[in-house]
Swiss-Prot record:
CDD domains: BAR_Gvp36 (cd07600). One of its GO terms (biological process) is endocytosis. Keywords: Cytoplasm, Meiosis. It holds the Pfam family BAR_2. This is Meiotically up-regulated gene 64 protein. Has a role in meiosis. SUPFAM superfamilies: BAR/IMD domain-like. Coiled coil: none annotated. It is found in: Cytoplasm. InterPro entries: AH/BAR_dom_sf (IPR027267), BAR_dom-cont (IPR018859).
Length: 286
């Protein structure tokens, strides 16, 4: 997942980096040539408004996504002081498996089964490294320490079972948020934002070309005047085409239904988690 995110971010930055220097060089060249003799052309208000909305939306997602991506970090709310227990568990499994090599085939059979079961349990525990799972494992250890005869042992046992259910539900919620929100933003919206940056630069370039064409008309000799005017009309058409193309892309990015559904998915998955967790916890009998 981290590799994928790095790849997407790298593509976006590379696209921006390749466009920005060209736009700056073009602007510098034109301003040097024109000076203050030609007033900068104004772009249509509806285009400018859409462009600003896209920039604002990108900034909004850049604020929210890194925080929501926390759900993709293994054990993000897992107590640090409990990780040693999990590490020790892993060492125990590895030790038992390594010791199999010193036994005869007949002796290996039952222990191999134990080692395999322990490895399977360890693998199964990895996706559910949440605070709830840590509470569950701690309560389970407490039950063992107290012994079956202690009247409070069953209470710790119930806590262990219920907290494990909630922890597993949280793991499901986090996976759903990652799939329905984080991956969608990275795979769909970020490439569109990169494309929006490219077409924005293209519009600016076409505008500068039109300004240059108009400057050529002012300084054209009579025999070249019609040619220069034709170049202005061509530049106007290219600018209008670039603006219309950009507006279509901007409107796709700003689609209210798509973005609302995307954001709603965070709340929907949280709501489902809390409802399912409440139902699971209501089974308590202590």
């Amino acid at each position: 997942m981290e590799t994928f995110k790095t790849h997407i971010t790298g593509q976006f930055n590379a696209t921006v980096s390749s466009i920005t220097p060209f736009a700056k060089k073009t602007t510098h060249y034109l301003r040097t040539k024109i000076g203050s003799r030609v007033e900068e052309l104004s772009l249509p208000e509806d285009y400018v408004e859409l462009e600003q909305q896209v920039d604002s939306l990108k900034e909004a997602y850049n604020l929210v996504l890194p925080i929501v991506e926390t759900v993709e970090v293994d054990g993000y709310d897992y107590p640090t002081n409990f990780r040693d227990s999990i590490t020790d568990f892993g060492k125990t499994v590895s030790g038992k498996v390594r010791n199999l090599g010193n036994l005869t085939p007949l002796e290996q059979t039952p222990l191999a089964s134990v080692g395999k079961n322990l490895e399977e349990k360890e693998a199964a525990a990895k996706p559910s490294r949440t605070l709830y799972n840590a509470i569950s494992r701690a309560a389970s250890e407490a039950t063992t320490k107290m012994g079956a005869g202690n009247p409070l042992s069953s209470a710790f046992g119930q806590i262990s079972v219920l907290e494990e259910k909630v922890g597993n539900l949280q793991g499901e919620r986090d996976s759903a948020i990652s799939k329905n929100f984080c991956e969608q933003v990275r795979a769909v919206l970020y490439p569109r934002f990169a494309e929006a940056h490219r077409v924005k630069a293209d519009v600016q370039d076409k505008r500068l070309q039109l300004e240059m064409a108009k400057l050529d008309v002012e300084s054209a000799k009579p025999e070249n005047l019609e040619h220069c005017k034709s170049a202005v009309r061509s530049a106007e058409d290219e600018l209008n085409g670039a603006i219309e193309h950009a507006k279509i892309l901007y409107e796709q990015i700003l689609n209210k239904d798509y973005n609302t559904d995307l954001l709603r998915s965070i709340i929907k998955n949280q709501l489902k988690f809390h409802q399912d967790a409440a139902a699971a916890l209501s089974d308590i009998t202590i």
